[in-house]
């Protein structure tokens, strides 16, 4: 699975692993420590977002 998220800079980011939820901050935290807003989860074999293929 792949995860689409929006980072603090407003950029869409694709993650291979799930961001973790930090209950103290009430936020999703990405692998690199940035707070993100999760937008979707996708099967790795069919990567599309808003009907457009996602390039990795």
Where would I find each of the regions flagged by the language model?
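A short beta-strand micro-motif
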Residues: 2-7
């Amino acid at each position: 699975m792949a995860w689409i998220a929006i980072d603090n800079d407003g950029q869409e980011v694709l993650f291979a692993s799930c961001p973790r939820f930090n209950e103290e901050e009430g936020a999703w935290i990405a692998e690199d420590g940035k707070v993100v807003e999760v937008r979707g989860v996708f099967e790795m074999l069919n990567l599309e977002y808003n009907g457009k293929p996602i390039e990795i």
